[in-house]
């Protein structure tokens, strides 16, 4: 007997590719299974057959028919730092380098596999209840920090509604290149996707709004508190680049892929014959706080993810060798 599902793309997932969207909404099924369903025409977008790479828009309707016996994705243990949990909502501190959903096949560990394992086997509130994680927003693989997950359809609808209504407040910590002069500002630049999968500012694009405040200045760098008001793909990264201050590490939109001590400390050189290890080699972006209403009518709460170890180490080094900018 086949299993049918229908989803409406929320604003928080606008711009996501069809295959990634299905993996987000149907995490129990393997990537290869979902690819096969798309190729066989068992998936439609707005009643039309679609390709795996189709970028979805807010309000698109995705319908899926899954045949009996379709291969499911297996849960697997992943070290998880649980920041908040009740019977309906889970917030975890996603480590950098861990993809939320499978990106290249099904070999690497993923957050979704770890969440499945946690809910089924470890959660004191949910194990044995048959619940599965329902993603309501995303973090890039190389971004660390707090991620909200719904446990049931009601919580998924409630959280998604808060994202769509811009009720949820998100706060990131970002290290960017150069000295940012304005203490605080709002970046209001519509974004559109290029043919190569990158995002760029464009008057033809969709509304994208980001606020920032300066936390600390260093010689050649600035530490920002960043509050995105919309949830476009790569929004923070593209907006910061647009004002001339890209993330200090961003291989896609910035100037480097790693930061080494030798680039910060003038007299430092690695020992002869040794290869220097970078202080940090991922996006200098951390999802620090999220404020939301876990259940209707109970009031807002804030969940905070401690600064990731590599980001914290980098900031300490900057304070020591790059002083105040």
Question: Which sequence ranges carry the predicted segments?
Answer:
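Short coil-to-beta-strand transition motifs
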Residues: 74-77, 202-210, 284-285
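Short beta-strand segments enriched for Tyr within beta-sheet-rich domains
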Residues: 159, 232-240
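Well-ordered beta-strand positions
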Residues: 83-84, 192, 213-216, 227, ...
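RNA pseudouridine synthases
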Residues: 1-196, 209, 307-320
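Short histidine-centered loop motifs in beta-beta connectors
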Residues: 47-49, 213, 219-220, 224-227
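Short, surface-exposed secondary-structure edge patches
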Residues: 51-55, 225, 282
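Pseudouridine synthases involved in rRNA/tRNA modification
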Residues: 1-36, 206, 216-219, 229, ...
């Amino acid at each position: 007997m086949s299993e049918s599902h229908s989803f409406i793309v929320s604003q928080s997932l606008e711009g996501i590719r069809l295959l990634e969207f299905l993996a987000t909404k149907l995490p129990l099924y393997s990537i290869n299974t979902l690819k096969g369903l798309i190729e066989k025409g068992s998936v439609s977008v707005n009643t039309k057959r679609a390709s795996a790479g189709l970028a979805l828009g807010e309000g698109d309707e995705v319908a899926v028919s899954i045949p009996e016996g379709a291969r499911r994705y297996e849960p697997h243990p992943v070290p998880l730092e649980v920041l908040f949990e009740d019977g309906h909502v889970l917030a975890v501190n996603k480590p950098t380098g861990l993809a939320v959903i499978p990106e290249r096949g099904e070999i690497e560990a993923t957050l979704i596999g770890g969440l499945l394992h946690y809910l089924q086997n470890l959660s004191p509130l949910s194990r044995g209840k048959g619940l599965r994680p329902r993603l309501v927003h995303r973090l890039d693989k190389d971004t660390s920090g707090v991620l909200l997950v719904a446990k049931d359809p009601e919580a998924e609808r409630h959280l998604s509604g808060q994202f769509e209504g811009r009720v949820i407040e998100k706060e990131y910590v970002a290290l960017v290149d150069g000295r940012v002069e304005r203490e605080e500002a709002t970046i209001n630049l519509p974004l559109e996707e290029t043919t190569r999968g990158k995002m760029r500012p464009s008057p033809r694009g969709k509304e994208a709004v980001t606020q920032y405040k300066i936390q600390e200045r260093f010689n050649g760098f600035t530490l920002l508190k960043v509050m995105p008001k919309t949830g476009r793909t790569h929004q923070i990264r593209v907006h910061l680049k647009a004002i001339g201050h890209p993330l200090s590490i961003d291989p896609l939109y910035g100037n480097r892929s790693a930061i080494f001590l030798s680039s910060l400390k003038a007299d430092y050189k690695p020992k002869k014959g040794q290869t220097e290890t970078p202080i940090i080699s991922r996006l200098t972006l951390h999802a620090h706080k999220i404020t939301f209403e876990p259940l209707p009518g109970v009031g807002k709460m804030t969940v905070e993810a401690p600064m990731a170890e590599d980001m914290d180490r980098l900031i300490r080094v900057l304070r020591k060798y790059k002083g105040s900018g």
